[in-house]
C-alpha cells in the first residue's frame, strides 16, 4: 500500500484559494490532521509523510492524533521550546492585514515575527520574483502562526509517536529551525 512514487504535493499541497467551506470557521490544527488522514485514506491507507518547517510540526501533530503513517520525515520543525515566542496575537494581526487587503504586509510580518528574518533579508525577498508567489499564500501564514502557537513545544503524545521519525536539520538556516 501507500503512495509509492506518486507525488502528492502537486495535487494535495497548499492552495492560494481559501477553502470556501471553511472560510468562516476558525482554523484548527486538528482539521489539517483530518485532511491529511483523508488524503492518506484516498491513496490506500498508509504513507510515509514528509513535512518541512511548520508542515513538520503539523505532520508530527497528525501522527500523535493517530493519522496512519509508516514513517515520518521532519525537516526543520520550528519548535521554540518556550523561547523567543512570537507575540500571542500574531495570528489575529496577520488575519487583519489579509482581511484589509494587505496580504503582502502579512507575509512580511510573518517573516519578521514568526520566522525571525532580519529586515535586510526581508527586503531582498520582497525585491525578488519569489515574493509575488508568496503573497497569494498569505492566508497560510495565519494557519502557520496558529499551529506553531498551539504547539511550540512537542506534546507528550507527539514525543511518543510509534512510527519511525527522521528529523532533518540544516546547518546554515534560520535560528528557530
Regions found by a protein language model. Give the residues of each.
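Conserved serine/cysteine hydrolase catalytic core
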Residues: 130-177
Amino acid at each position: 500500500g501507500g503512495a509509492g512514487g506518486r507525488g502528492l504535493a502537486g495535487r494535495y499541497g497548499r492552495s492560494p484559494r481559501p477553502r470556501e467551506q471553511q472560510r468562516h470557521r476558525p482554523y484548527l490544527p486538528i482539521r489539517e490532521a483530518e485532511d491529511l488522514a483523508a488524503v492518506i485514506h484516498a491513496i490506500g491507507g498508509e504513507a510515509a509523510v514528509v513535512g518541512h518547517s511548520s508542515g513538520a510540526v503539523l505532520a508530527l501533530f497528525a501522527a500523535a492524533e493517530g493519522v496512519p503513517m509508516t514513517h515520518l520525515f521532519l525537516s526543520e520543525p520550528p519548535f521554540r521550546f518556550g523561547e523567543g515566542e512570537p507575540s500571542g496575537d500574531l495570528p489575529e494581526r496577520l488575519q487583519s492585514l489579509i482581511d484589509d487587503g494587505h496580504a503582502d504586509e502579512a507575509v512580511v510580518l510573518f517573516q519578521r515575527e514568526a520566522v525571525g528574518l532580519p529586515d535586510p533579508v526581508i527586503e531582498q525577498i520582497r525585491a525578488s520574483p519569489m515574493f509575488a508567489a508568496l503573497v497569494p499564500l498569505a492566508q497560510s501564514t495565519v494557519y502557520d502562526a496558529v499551529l506553531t502557537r498551539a504547539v511550540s513545544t512537542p506534546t507528550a503524545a507527539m514525543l511518543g509517536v510509534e512510527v519511525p521519525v527522521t528529523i532533518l536539520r540544516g546547518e546554515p538556516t534560520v535560528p528557530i529551525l
